[in-house]
């Protein structure tokens, strides 16, 4: 079985094609800067006998043109003979709202609902839908599966996902915590349970997906019971350009003091805050270099980021009562050893003790970073959201075939 995974952003298309016999990628790539003056198309073959790599700078007018280019080059490069041989297409859809708690086979009704949910994810859901619509028109016989970023967190109890606002706002406008990075949190939790030889339905963990966008999740008996992101990905941890948790009155105060519109203030909170807001840079590599040279702003940004993560670990330790593992994943979680070290520093009394030599040289695969005989295991796990989407799509297709 061959499954194509598509992840359409506001100006990009990421894709990965899998052979599901061995869960191995056949190809991966990216179309970026869509709609801009000059875009870029990258496609890499992962076949043993074919290690071709395509890199082209060209105009990519819209998502449909980008998808046509990907389709054309997958056959031209000899990765697949015919696009129609693909058994299913799995789509990452950011916002599933209250409607979608699991992967779903796409039909007209599902497409309408994804469109209706665009109000909660105006940058992402319309792009996700564009990919679905393209395939529906060009290859209507290929089953499409929508896998929602929010679905893993659908198991949160109401006391964790509700905001203490007038209840009618939830009833009318579905204002509540949804959480994101669900596909990543789900994937690494399953990998961790397998690695530690704990049945997944008995596994408890705190998962930290740390990157330019970051979130924490409390996982109890294999299910999400709380997460740091909220109605949107702005809430929670300090991120590359997002502020994370703040007093909501700050929005009104900035608008009054700086004479800004609501739209301008929200742009500041989403795109000019976080690490970038504190030290002028959201590249962790640059921040680390500056910090080591004694740069006060870089040091402050790093310390604020670490402190916020520690607060969430502490809160989720109380929520979960028993914790089997702390999981680090995402671009920073996987690659930023100094961040992992600082997050774990001083948590020994909670049963969390990092083995520094392993942390400094963790390799590229799943690794246990804990000192021997510690109560809670610290795991560094490379996430693979595309594979998780492919696995969920495969499961759906097999169910359809049985029916």
Curated annotation (Swiss-Prot):
Substrate binds at residue 92. It holds the Pfam family Acetate_kinase. The record marks 181, 242 as: Transition state stabilizer. The active site is at residue 149. The keyword Lyase does not apply. Mg(2+) binds at residues 7, 385. It comes from the Bacteria. Pathway: Metabolic intermediate biosynthesis; acetyl-CoA biosynthesis; acetyl-CoA from acetate: step 1/2. GO terms for biological process: acetate metabolic process; acetyl-CoA biosynthetic process. Disulfide bonds: none annotated. Mg(2+). Can also accept Mn(2+). Transmembrane segments: none annotated. CDD domains: ASKHA_NBD_AcK_PK. Its cofactor is Mg(2+); Mn(2+). It catalyses: acetate + ATP = acetyl phosphate + ADP. ATP binds at residues 14, 209-213, 283-285, 331-335. Keywords: ATP-binding, Cytoplasm, Kinase, Magnesium, Metal-binding, Nucleotide-binding, Transferase. GO terms for molecular function: acetate kinase activity; ATP binding; magnesium ion binding. It is found in: Cytoplasm. Its EC number is 2.7.2.1. GO terms for cellular component: cytoplasm. PROSITE patterns: ACETATE_KINASE_1 (PS01075), ACETATE_KINASE_2 (PS01076). Catalyzes the formation of acetyl phosphate from acetate and ATP. Can also catalyze the reverse reaction. Homodimer. Belongs to the acetokinase family. This is Acetate kinase. The gene is ackA.
